[in-house]
Amino acid sequence: MRICLVLEGSYPYVHGGVSTWMHAYIQAMPQQEFSLWVIGAKAQDRGKFVYELPPNVKEVEEVFLDDALRLHGERQPVLFTADERTALRELVRLGSPDWDVLYRLFQEKGVHPLSFLQSRDFMELFKDICLQEYPYVAYADAFHTMRSMLLPVLYLLTGRVPKADVYHAISTGYGGLLACMGGSLNHAPVLLTEHGIYTREREEEIIRAEWVVPSFKSRWIRFFYMLSEEIYRRAFRVSSLFYNARRTQIEMGCNAEKCIVIPNGVQYERFCNIPLKQEDGWVDIGAVVRLAPIKDVKTMIYAFFEIGRAHV
């Protein structure tokens, strides 16, 4: 069996929790073949792996989002069908597009991303959105925001699709979308394992981001929610690490019957002989954390302080 792992910004380029897990996951099933379909931010990272890939990794398909910025070519007129036009309209409006129609449009029909983004259909949709949602925002800001939002997605939809018997996405977002496209085109099952809730992480980043025009922050957030809806709908199984994450997935629209929790385990033998603290009347609370903005360690420290002050 060939398993295609779809990853974004992690294995095999960087060390970390997801990467460590992925490496162990592949090594634990030497009888299975794996393809890696990996999304990176910059093409300059091509081939710069920090892991020695196990021998059962048979293929690595690398895709880099900044390559979308280098797309060029003259606009080729395209005559869209009614279904294609409806799906594209829903995509631009960040609604509920028929992704199967879009997969076929950009894969089988071979439509170039710029052929749509420079088409009359797109400009009419864009004009309507500006009039309805952003009447007081500069036209240039609106245009470049919309283009930068859609171009990477359309670029990903035109890329090569590795063949596999099952597609396993390790996040929603761009990676989840590629897994769904692979499953759709090759009639293969799709499953999702979320190490963290990708959409919520992007939402927090967007809220804090200075590069996002304030008027468009809600639109960027809607964009990532739209992507997550596709894999929550298509995946036959959705797993997370803890029950609050499962609850969040369900709140975001995933069918509860699909959602399971597989907690991280520990090797009990490594920790069972740690001596207990000598009794001194205090309750000591420790934390093993990674220093990263998404972990919000600062709030944890404040919480420890407030708890300690309340009980002095």
Short names for language-model regions:
Residues 1-130:
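N-terminal subdomain of nucleotide-sugar transferases
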Residues 275-305:
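Conserved donor-binding/catalytic core segment of Leloir-type glycosyltransferases
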Residues 142-166, 176-178, 226:
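An amphipathic, basic-hydrophobic alpha-helix
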Residues 3, 166, 183-210, 239:
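Active-site proximal beta-strand in glycosyltransferases
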Residues 14, 267, 290-293, 308:
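Nucleotide-sugar-dependent glycosyltransferase donor-binding/catalytic pocket residues
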Residues 95, 101, 158-176, 185-191, ...:
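Short N-terminal targeting/anchoring amphipathic segment
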Residues 153-163, 184-185, 197-198, 215-238:
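Membrane-proximal helix-turn-helix segments that form the acceptor-binding/catalytic region
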Residues 244, 265:
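Carbohydrate-associated surface elements
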